Amino acid sequence: MDFPQHSQHVLEQLNQQRQLGLLCDCTFVVDGVHFKAHKAVLAACSEYFKMLFVDQKDVVHLDISNAAGLGQVLEFMYTAKLSLSPENVDDVLAVATFLQMQDIITACHALKSLAEPATSPGGNAEALATEGGDKRAKEEKVATSTLSRLEQAGRSTPIGPSRDLKEERGGQAQSAASGAEQTEKADAPREPPPVELKPDPTSGMAAAEAEAALSESSEQEMEVEPARKGEEEQKEQEEQEEEGAGPAEVKEEGSQLENGEAPEENENEESAGTDSGQELGSEARGLRSGTYGDRTESKAYGSVIHKCEDCGKEFTHTGNFKRHIRIHTGEKPFSCRECSKAFSDPAACKAHEKTHSPLKPYGCEECGKSYRLISLLNLHKKRHSGEARYRCEDCGKLFTTSGNLKRHQLVHSGEKPYQCDYCGRSFSDPTSKMRHLETHDTDKEHKCPHCDKKFNQVGNLKAHLKIHIADGPLKCRECGKQFTTSGNLKRHLRIHSGEKPYVCIHCQRQFADPGALQRHVRIHTGEKPCQCVMCGKAFTQASSLIAHVRQHTGEKPYVCERCGKRFVQSSQLANHIRHHDNIRPHKCSVCSKAFVNVGDLSKHIIIHTGEKPYLCDKCGRGFNRVDNLRSHVKTVHQGKAGIKILEPEEGSEVSVVTVDDMVTLATEALAATAVTQLTVVPVGAAVTADETEVLKAEISKAVKQVQEEDPNTHILYACDSCGDKFLDANSLAQHVRIHTAQALVMFQTDADFYQQYGPGGTWPAGQVLQAGELVFRPRDGAEGQPALAETSPTAPECPPPAE
């Protein structure tokens, strides 16, 4: 059973998805206008896209600079309808020839032939016979015949994505034949009448005949000499790219680029286009044979295929073919004006010249910001002149294009739409993602001549080379450090200025970098967005997840070239190399011992300060090294405990409160109360968990008094016997029971009687304190043996101590 309308229904659904932006995996950006599409549809309709997507490039620059023509071609792909007019036929033809869509090319040529001016008012054969009139008449006849055939063939309902070429012109539709008979005055061009063309897929012969006739009559060649063309195209493309109004960019949805004012960020895609996108299979159409001179002769797009006799590759663009030939001949006609290095391609030569002096000579008089191109400066000046009409609602910043505004809004939302397919790490801009992909790609062909660092993309190498430029535009004036982007330099300058513009909404702590703020906020929210797909363990940072995943896979991609040792992270390799070179820039101010990295120095300083910042969250014991804490957790708690790292806020005062201090404070606090007697019992007697709770309550009281005197005091709880410090009273109270001679503070309040245990105390002879028993005495202080209680009184509730 056949369903003739099924293919038409599928095409309609795809068009609706395109209009709504659903399931689109490709985006064109032309003149700031975004066109979404499906790669499968593009490849089905265009030989160019079919070959292009085989290479799977994320971003490709196309020689398409008019949004109107591209919009018409996309509309044709999804609806099989094309609105042609004398005003837009050139734009549509330019796009169609570049994308190798022969049906549209044929129709555009036919329409242009009908629109050519007549040489005489009568328009008869005799007048046409003069000055090439016979040739023009023949072309007109073929074009009219072609349009008529296509119209007749299209009267049957097309099945599948057949081409409907439709020209709408406000008035009543007329046939192509009647339009061909109309004539006008000699001084006015004769325009074609409005027609509706519906070519059937079976009308290929008519299209082929028309193509052959029209290609022979082509009077205008669409190419220039490759040397001049390459340089001019490269310059024009750069200017238009960075102004946001340049050649179309074809992008996969996962790595979409907004056009706009970030030339430093987008320079790595300037040379992304390759010849491979314009190569065709041998079955595409017949080859035109001839000598080398014939094959290099400039022809219109799609009118001839050039085949390399050495390797068999085919090209429709003469300029691409000439550049390819230089691979075999070894010819390098383009040389760098600074170092005379030779190149076979003008774009590569131009990119190389930028590495010598990527300065920005065009400066803004208003704010001093500089640009490499005058066109970018003019675009920037729109901000000051009030032409920047796109305003951010969050911070009020103005932008000249909507694309720049959208990219800026990601800063406020924290959204990172560009995700790495290998490790899941997300990025707010595609350039950062592309640079991150360097860590996964082992095939790095582009090598830095200064430091031997390698890259898999020439754009990333170009960005890296800025580091080696003496007195370059991205050099910190304070410390001389070089950066690849102005954004990185701006963040670095905050280190010297002390500026911290990013504030945590939970604790008001300030940060110089938005990424640091984002990681800090996760401490409050408990968010761990980076989850391991193998074991389910979650992490707050993507870098931690990457290192963790490599533990599963055993991957150690970073190799020391000197000893062959491999590492999970690049920072580990960098530290390892410093050991080889004996570079120890971090020196201890107390003993002058030097260390390779600042982390080792921080661990060493703890020896001098006696600090134990690594705390076991199970028992509260502190350690001066994290490896000692891990060993403790493993042996004492069988691995069922966590780790706390004590990091006091900057500028806060740290007050160490010992057990002896707490006893004194508690005694002084109770001096005015009705305390009858304090009895001291050796710890050798039974000490219960209930008594420990009593101790915690009294410690809390003492801490409360300290905090009332100075609310900003940060309190650590220290053990008198071993010096261990704890974050809270509970941890200290649990720890106290480890030492046999340690004191427990217990005292009497208005309602209950408590005791203080101490090493120097005595106990009435014959009196044994059993577990769960407390000593009660009369409030009037009457002498006698203490009475025993079956249960312990409940400890008074106190506010929790500050951590």
From Swiss-Prot:
It is found in: Nucleus. The modification Phosphoserine is found at residue 120. A zinc finger (C2H2-type) spans 306-328, 334-356, 362-384, 390-412, 418-440, 446-468, 474-496, 502-524, 530-552, 558-580, 586-608, 614-637, 717-739. It holds the Pfam family zf-C2H2_4. Undergoes 'Lys-48'-linked polyubiquitination at Lys-397 and Lys-481 and subsequent proteasomal degradation in a TRAF2-dependent manner. Keywords: Developmental protein, DNA-binding, Isopeptide bond, Metal-binding, Nucleus, Phosphoprotein, Repeat, Transcription, Transcription regulation, Ubl conjugation, Zinc, Zinc-finger. Residues 637-803 are annotated as: Interaction with HCFC1. One of its GO terms (molecular function) is RNA polymerase II cis-regulatory region sequence-specific DNA binding. Residues 116-295, 779-803 are annotated as: Disordered. There is a cross-link at residues 397, 481 (Glycyl lysine isopeptide (Lys-Gly) (interchain with G-Cter in ubiquitin)). Expressed in germinal center B-cells. GO terms for biological process: ectoderm development; G1 to G0 transition; gastrulation with mouth forming second; negative regulation of cell cycle; negative regulation of cell population proliferation; negative regulation of transcription by RNA polymerase II; positive regulation of transcription by RNA polymerase II; regulation of cytokine production. Residues 1-104 form the BTB domain. One of its GO terms (cellular component) is protein-containing complex. Residues 171-180, 206-217 have a biased composition (Low complexity). Residues 269-308, 637-718 are annotated as: Interaction with MYC. PROSITE patterns: BTB (PS50097), ZINC_FINGER_C2H2_1 (PS00028), ZINC_FINGER_C2H2_2 (PS50157). Residues 132-142 have a biased composition (Basic and acidic residues). Belongs to the krueppel C2H2-type zinc-finger protein family. Transcription factor that can function as an activator or repressor depending on its binding partners, and by targeting negative regulators of cell cycle progression. Plays a critical role in early lymphocyte development, where it is essential to prevent apoptosis in lymphoid precursors, allowing them to survive in response to IL7 and undergo proper lineage commitment. Has been shown to bind to the promoters of adenovirus major late protein and cyclin D1 and activate transcription. Required for early embryonic development during gastrulation. Homooligomerizes (via the BTB/POZ domain), multimerization is required for DNA binding. Interacts (via the C-terminal zinc fingers) with GIF1; the interaction results in the recruitment of MYB to the CDKN1A/p21 and CDKN1B promoters and repression of transcription. Interacts with TRAF2, interfering with the binding of UBC13 to TRAF2, and inhibiting TRAF2 E3 ligase activity. Interacts with MYC (via the C-terminal helix-loop-helix motif); the interaction inhibits ZBTB17 transactivation and growth arrest activities and renders it insoluble in the nucleus. This is Zinc finger and BTB domain-containing protein 17. It comes from Homo sapiens.
